[in-house]
Amino acid sequence: MLRIAVDCMGGDYAPLEIVRGCILAAKELGYKIYLVGDKEQIIPILEKAKEHNNSLLEVVHAPDKVEMHEPPSNVLKKKNSSLYVAGMLVRKGEADGLVSAGNTGAVLAVGKFIVGAEEEVERPSIGVALPNPKGKTVLIDVGANVDCKPKHLVQFAVIGHTYAEEILGIKNPRVGILSIGEEEGKGNELVKETYPLLKATKLNFKGNAEGRDIYAGTFDVIVCDGFVGNVILKASESLGLAVVQMIKEEIKRSILAKLGALLLMPALNRFKKKADFAEYGGIPLLGAKKPVIITHGRANAKAIKNAVRVAGEFLNTDFNKKLVYNLKTLIPEGVKV
C-alpha cells in the first residue's frame, strides 16, 4: 500500500480543503494518508465527516506551520512545522511521497535538503506538462532554479526527456531550448552557451524553441531557467482564466449567443477542464529521491486528491531509475562540467 504524507497546514484553504482532499484520496485511491498538521484543527474535520476511525487516515501532529510570506529557509529551522515533519516522514521511509499546497520555496527546500536529490541530479527541477493540440509539451524548469548555468539546463533537458518518455509515453521526445529566435546564435548568453552543449548530447535536440512553440506541439520538451519558466506558467494560468471569463461575458450579450453556447457546452467544458489546475493536481519536483508534489496555493479538495494521485503515478513507474541511467548515458563526459 502506498503511503503519502500531506502537509495539511499549507495553502489558502488549509486545513479544511486539504483534509477533505485527503479523505477523497483515501476513498478513491486506497492509499494510506498521513495528515500532517495541528491535530486540534484536523481531528474535528475528520469527526464531522465521520472519517476519524478510517484506518487509511492517520493524523501526525505538527503544531507549527510555514507561512506563505516566510523565507523558504525557515522550514529547515521550524522542525515542528507540518511541512518539515511531512518531509521527515519521507526521509525516514515512513511515507513514500509528499504533497503540499504551502510555501513553494519551502516545499522546494524540503525536497532538496530533507527528502534529498537522486544520484547524479545536481539540481532538482520542476517540470509541467502543458496542453497542446497534439498532446502535451513539458516545460522545464518552472520555478525551482531561477539562476542557472548551462550545465544545469543540460540536466533539465535530460530530466524533461525522461519525464516525457516515462510519464507521458512520448518516444524519442523532441527537445528545444527556449529563445527569442529559432536560428542558432539567437538568445541571451545562457541560451547561446547551452545550445552547443545540448547539441553534443544524445538527446533528440531540435534547436531553439520560440514562445509560440510552447502550445503548438512542435517540441515535446522545452528547456529554460526557472525564472522564465515561472513567468510563463503564471501568465498561462492567468490567460486561461481570462479566456474562460471573456467567453462567459460574450455569451451573455445575446439570445443567439446563449443558444450557441448550449450547443458548444460539451466542448467548452472540455476546454475548461484542460485549464483547471485542480484536474492536474500538482507538479512534481523532478530529481528528488521520492515524489514531492507541489500543488497550487488555492488548492481545493479535488486538487489535493489529484496531487496524491500524481504522487502515486510516479511511485508506480521506474522514473528515478531511468533518470539516473539517462543522466549517465545521454550526456557525454565532456559536457559534464
Swiss-Prot record:
Catalyzes the reversible formation of acyl-phosphate (acyl-PO(4)) from acyl-[acyl-carrier-protein] (acyl-ACP). This enzyme utilizes acyl-ACP as fatty acyl donor, but not acyl-CoA. It comes from the Bacteria. GO terms for molecular function: phosphate:acyl-[acyl carrier protein] acyltransferase activity. One of its GO terms (biological process) is phospholipid biosynthetic process. The lineage of its organism: Bacteria, Pseudomonadati, Aquificota, Aquificia, Aquificales. HAMAP family: PlsX. It comes from Aquifex aeolicus (strain VF5). This is Phosphate acyltransferase. Coiled coil: none annotated.
